């Protein structure tokens, strides 16, 4: 979702927020519009200030964070089939994988599990990732 495209009004932005509330995406890729030389949009009039775009962006991110938190909290204590992708980049000794719903889950396990599907129980739902426990 691009926030603050030239000509976008606050009313149009609120329509975007309404759609996001209705759909409740698992995740969003969001950006503040920035002009790119050579594009038509770069030469368009842009009455929205950078500060306004930043406020809109924060509003969008806060909304998505609350949606993500609501969704992941419902996953606690459930077991999911997970594709084990790699060792965790941020947590040594942990593996990282994805549920069938594309949600990242980290759990303890041997690196030999990478590339396989495993059942993992969600022990701690966070906004953007899950912590879990490998099931036998």
Regions found by a protein language model. Give the residues of each.
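Terminal RNA-binding accessory module
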Residues: 43-136
